A protein has these predicted regions:
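Short, charge-rich binding segments
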Residues: 44-46, 54-57, 103
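Gly/Ser-rich oxyanion-binding loop with an adjacent helix/lid
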Residues: 1-22, 28, 32, 37, ...
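C-terminal nucleotide
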Residues: 2-27, 52-85, 182-331, 346-386
Length: 386
């Protein structure tokens, strides 16, 4: 990211004095999809694209913000019970409120920021913005006493209370805890996590953005969640002696016991979730051995499950996955909730340029617009730049 871009705008739009510069990254999730609300594992990593902000206390009770990307300026009082109307500024307002609830005496400050996280690519630009300001306020006003977990939870609470998005914790977790060259297996039940090496010599990791988003009738995500909960309910009824809260607690044998009762649709969805738990663990094992071929194979298996069992793919994403296979890409799958968005791809260096050229040409010919392609590198989490 461009430090000079932030500094020059900060000096221009405020009083000519410099502040501290902070950066928080967006994220990818290599594998572990639709597992968070089923108590399973996710496997994210921070990337080399994110939000960078220059921030300096201004000695007042007013927060003065400048969005470099939007060329927009917003001010609000730290203790204003309403907060700003501008949607982008509400993320920062929410973080101020959450940090104060954690005991940080937030005062007025000046801030200029920009981002290079591609919008609509499922890389969590909003979590990067929240994490950047939470980290900065902890440093500037809190003597860094607030824990990393509480910084991540402050971002999640901001989404819930001030934005109206009922998100999970993965995005903020990855932005705060990320490490260069490491992916993180997060247990969504216990919030325990472990770092795993991701140094794919001879490979590139890239996202291919279909730039489509299908709006479906009804509530497709709630439907799938209800399917999973229905399976758990039926298994729990057969095993009153055991404690079943999510599919994470269930075995393959128990799923087979209730197959006829729950019906094929609910069975297939639960089958995907149990398989995804096993695939995450297999990928962790493969990474410790440096076995990226197995990592790629599990990515393809996840795409198949998301498409055929969980049924959250779409024609465009399946097409991108097929083109990846045709080009000998090591691994490819849907990343994110589905029904549009991106695939994440593990591509050998020696075929990367050919793959980019081929997928761009074929997708454009079929759908009338080019996909966007973003190479990403697994990078450091939230930090002070200077």
């Amino acid at each position: 990211m461009d430090i000079e871009k932030v500094r020059s705008r900060f000096i221009k739009h405020f009083d000519g004095k410099t502040g501290n510069i902070y950066m928080s990254p967006g994220r990818i999730n290599l594998i572990g999809e639709h597992t968070d609300y089923n108590g399973g594992f996710v496997f994210p990593g921070a990337v080399d694209k994110g939000i960078m902000a220059e921030i300096r206390p201004n000695g007042t009770d007013t927060v003065m913000l400048y969005s470099i990307d939007l060329k927009d300026r917003v001010e609000f009082k730290v203790n204003d019970p309403e907060g700003p109307r501008a949607s982008w500024a509400r993320y920062i307002y929410g973080i101020c409120q959450e940090m104060m609830s954690l005991g940080v005496e937030v005062k007025g400050f000046n801030a200029a920021f920009y981002g290079d996280v591609p919008l609509g690519a499922g890389m969590s630009s909003s979590a990067a913005l929240e994490s950047c300001f939470a980290f900065a306020l902890n440093d500037l006003f809190g003597d860094n006493k607030v824990s990393k977990w509480d910084l991540a939870l402050a971002g999640q609470a901001t989404e819930h209370k001030y934005i109206g998005v009922n998100c999970g914790i993965m995005d903020q977790f990855a932005s705060v805890f990320g490490k260069e060259g490491k992916l993180m297996r997060l247990d969504c039940n216990s919030r325990e996590f472990e770092y795993f090496p991701f140094n794919p010599q001879g490979y590139k990791l890239c996202l291919v953005n279909s730039k489509v988003k299908h709006e479906l009738a009804g509530s497709p995500y709630n439907d799938r969640r209800n399917s999973c909960e229905n399976v758990v309910k039926h298994i729990a009824a057969k095993h009153p002696e055991a404690k079943f809260e999510t599919l994470r607690d269930c075995t393959w044998e128990q799923l087979e016991e209730v197959r006829a009762e729950v019906g094929e649709e609910d069975y297939s969805r639960a089958h995907f979730v149990l398989g995804e738990k096993d695939r995450v663990l297999a990928v962790c094992d493969a990474l410790e051995k440096g076995d990226y071929e197995t990592v790629g194979q599990k990515m393809y298996e996840t795409h198949y499950g998301l498409s055929k069992e969980y049924e959250v793919s779409c024609e465009e994403l399946d097409f991108l996955n097929d083109v990846a296979k045709e080009n000998g890409v090591t691994g490819s799958r849907i990343m994110g909730g589905g029904f549009g968005g991106c695939t994440i791809n593990l591509v050998k260096d020696d075929i990367y340029d050919k793959f980019v050229e081929d997928v761009t040409a074929k997708f454009t010919a079929k759908y009338g617009h080019a996909p966007e392609i973003y190479p990403v590198v697994i990078s450091e989490g939230s930090h002070k730049v200077c």
